[in-house]
């Protein structure tokens, strides 16, 4: 796999839209995957024998233009590949504000303080653990609406797919979602790579 942290971050600036406002959503099985509200990690695991998270990079960085309008400070950016039986299926990019990381955490005055702080620290200690396991297992984290976007074949993510020996014949589709945690929000974007699209569209 010809990918290193040297090129991190891979994310590119793009406008995201509500699915109801896009007429060009793919008329295929991929559309259902884009709009599914459950954990993508759990769903991917049902389509392979071995699921793996490959970390491309993670660091405190400035978000891209218009990527996280509510944030004026650097955020924790984590980019990974979700791989099924050794094949990268999904590029995932997560943006976590410092209020969630704990560096600007308020002084909580209740019995849940220790639990909250431990949960915040988990985001920077994930390693190869899927973020979805944390997002969908905590009763304190509430998922928001799904937005979608179409990535051009000449963009950075298409170049990433090409470096993974996946031919990009058409634009890539992705989705993103805000997750709410104790008054703060983090963003998770998931872009389906060509290998995933080929498999999904061939499935019944």
Curated annotation (Swiss-Prot):
One GO cellular component term, please give it.
cytosol
Q: So which domain of life are we looking at? A: Bacteria
Record's function text? Removes the pyruvyl group from chorismate, with concomitant aromatization of the ring, to provide 4-hydroxybenzoate (4HB) for the ubiquinone pathway.
Family in the record: Belongs to the UbiC family.
By what name is this protein known?
Answer: Probable chorismate pyruvate-lyase
Query: Is the keyword Chaperone in the record?
Result: no
Residues given in the record as substrate binding sites: 78, 131, 190
Pathway, per UniProt? Cofactor biosynthesis; ubiquinone biosynthesis
Q: Which organism is it from?
A: Shewanella frigidimarina (strain NCIMB 400)
Coiled coil located at which positions?
none
Q: Which reaction does it catalyse?
A: chorismate = 4-hydroxybenzoate + pyruvate
Name the GO terms of the biological process aspect: pyruvate biosynthetic process; ubiquinone biosynthetic process
Query: If you read the UniProt record, what top EC class would you report for this enzyme, in one word?
Result: lyase
The gene for this chain is ubiC
Q: Where in the cell is it found?
A: Cytoplasm
Q: What is its EC number?
A: 4.1.3.40
Q: What is the lineage of its organism?
A: Bacteria, Pseudomonadati, Pseudomonadota, Gammaproteobacteria, Alteromonadales
């Amino acid at each position: 796999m010809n990918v290193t942290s040297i090129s991190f971050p891979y994310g590119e600036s793009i406008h995201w839209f509500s699915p109801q406002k896009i007429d060009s959503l793919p008329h295929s099985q991929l559309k259902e995957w884009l709009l599914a509200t459950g954990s993508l990690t759990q769903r991917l695991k049902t389509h392979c024998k071995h699921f793996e998270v490959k970390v491309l990079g993670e660091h405190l960085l400035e978000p891209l233009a218009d990527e996280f309008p509510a944030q004026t400070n650097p955020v924790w950016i984590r980019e990974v590949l979700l791989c099924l039986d050794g094949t990268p299926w999904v590029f995932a990019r997560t943006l976590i504000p410092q209020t969630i990381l704990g560096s600007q955490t308020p002084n909580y005055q209740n019995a849940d303080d220790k639990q909250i702080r431990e949960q915040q620290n988990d985001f920077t200690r994930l390693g190869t653990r899927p973020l979805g396991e944390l997002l969908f297992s905590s009763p304190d984290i509430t998922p928001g609406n799904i937005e979608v976007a179409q990535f051009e074949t000449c963009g950075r993510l298409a170049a990433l797919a090409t470096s993974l020996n996946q031919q990009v014949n058409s634009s890539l589709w992705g989705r993103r979602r805000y997750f709410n945690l104790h008054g703060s929000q983090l963003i998770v974007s998931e872009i389906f790579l060509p290998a995933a699209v080929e498999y999904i569209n061939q499935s019944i």
